[in-house]
Curated annotation (Swiss-Prot):
Pfam families: DUF167. It comes from the Bacteria. Belongs to the UPF0235 family. Signal peptide: none annotated. GO terms for cellular component: cytoplasm. This is UPF0235 protein RPB_0109. InterPro entries: DUF167, YggU-like_sf.
Length: 108
C-alpha cells in the first residue's frame, strides 16, 4: 500500500479520514478509499461541531508524533471527514513515526 503522506522540506502532509464521536482518541491504521487513495484512519471523541473534532485531530497527531501543536495545521477538509494535515518537522523522522503508528493496525 502506498503511503498516506507526502514529504516536503518543512515536514509531511498527511491524508486522514476522521471518525468523530469515537470511543477514544487514536490512530486506527491505514485505509484505501474507493478511489484508491490511502488515508490514515483517526478516531476522536470530540463531536464534529464548531471545529472541536479538528482541534482533537491536531492534538492527537501532535501527541502521537511528539511535535508541538503549533507544528500541526489543517490544510483542507475543515468540514469534511477527509482532511489534509501539514506537520512541520524532520520529514524522515515524521515519516518513520507515521509508518510505525499505522503499521500496528492492518489496512482496511
Amino acid at each position: 500500500m502506498a503511503e498516506a503522506w507526502r514529504y516536503s522540506a518543512q515536514g509531511v502532509a498527511v491524508a486522514v479520514r476522521v471518525t468523530p464521536r469515537g470511543d477514544r482518541d487514536e490512530i486506527d491504521g491505514l485505509e484505501t478509499l474507493s478511489d484508491g487513495r490511502p488515508v490514515v484512519k483517526l478516531r476522536v471523541r470530540a463531536i464534529a461541531d464548531g471545529g472541536e473534532a479538528n482541534r482533537a485531530v491536531i492534538e492527537l497527531l501532535a501527541k502521537a508524533l511528539g511535535v508541538p501543536k503549533r507544528n500541526v495545521r489543517l490544510l483542507s477538509g475543515a468540514t469534511s471527514r477527509q482532511k489534509q494535515i501539514a506537520i512541520d518537522g524532520d520529514p524522515k523522522s515524521l515519516g518513520e513515526t507515521l509508518r510505525q503508528l499505522t503499521a500496528a493496525k492492518p489496512a482496511g
